[in-house]
Each structure stands twice: as C-alpha cells, then as structure tokens.
Amino acid sequence: MNKKMFLGIGIFWLIIVIGFVAFKEFTLITGKEVLLKTMPVDPRDLFRGDYVVLNYDISALDFNSLPTDSANFNDSDRVYVTLKIEDKYGVPTGIYRDPPKEGLFIKGTVKDVQGNGLIIEYGIESYFVPEGKGWEIQRQSGRNLEVKVAIDKFGNAVIKSLLIEGKEINFES
C-alpha cells in the first residue's frame, strides 16, 4: 500500500509540474507578442539569484481616465486591461472586471488603490537572468528598456525577452 501511495503522490506532482510548464508554453506559442515599456527596479535576491524586477507603464493606471465597468476597485481584485498597439507599444485602453469578448487584453491583480489610481500586477514583474547580469541591466536604467511578452487569448502573459534600445539582450555570452 505504501508503494502505491508513494507512486500516486509522485505522479500527482509530476502532472502538476508538467501542467505548469505546458500552461506557460501554451501562452508562449499561441500568445500575441506585445512590447511593454518598463524600467528595472531591483536586480538581486540573495536567496533566488539575479533577477530584474520590472515596473511597467501599464502597472499604474488612473481608472477615471480609462473606460471601465466598475466605479470602485479593491486590493486583490482580478482585472482585465484592454490594450492597443500604439507606436509599437501596448498601451491601456480600458480596465474591466470581466474578460473582454474580443481584442487584446492582459489579466492582472489590483495590488493597491490610491485615490483614482490602481497599481496592478500581471505576473510578469520579475525576470530571472544569469548570475552577474542583473546589475548590468540595472546600470542600463537610463536607456530605453522594453519587454517582449506573449499574451494568450485568456489574458495570461509570459515574458519572452528583454530589449535595450530595441535590441534583444543575449545572455549566452
């Protein structure tokens, strides 16, 4: 009985890991590529290694200046931000509680409400990089940093790459 239970638990966790990877791969393969303006915030975590915390232009929104289906939002609310491509970047065009039936949108969570403003996280706020590269990206903060994301039809976003001055950062060298 112990062997069967151990095997069952192992299979259960294997399915979870495969499901997580498949979910991200689905978004990368089927998602629409969108460029987002960003700037790095913090490049290092002693326990997790080098990564870049990214702060997007679409992360702080004034819901009085954008169409919305709600008069008030609260922390932890799920929101859907509609986007249009303008001058090659994804820019917000509305904030909604329910996913739009069509068009490009990104799913997020309200992290803070500040007057008429919302701070929204999309699950793409950190990007792990090879050791020693986080500080290099941080030093580039005065330059134009962009993030190429894939957004699937459900609004899920996955980072595909980082770009500085329009050139993709290659971490291989």
Can you say where each PLM-predicted feature lies in the sequence?
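Long, non-globular segments of proteins
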Residues: 3-4, 21, 31, 41-42, ...
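Hydrophobic membrane-insertion alpha-helices, especially the h-region
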Residues: 4-23
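Aromatic-capped interface at the extracytoplasmic side
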Residues: 17-38
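Cell-surface/extracellular proteins and modules involved
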Residues: 28, 51, 60, 168-173
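Extracytoplasmic
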Residues: 31-33, 76-78, 142-146
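Short extracytoplasmic
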Residues: 38-68
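Short, compositionally biased
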Residues: 65-88
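Extracytoplasmic/periplasmic terminal helices and flexible tails
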Residues: 81-86, 92-96, 106-173
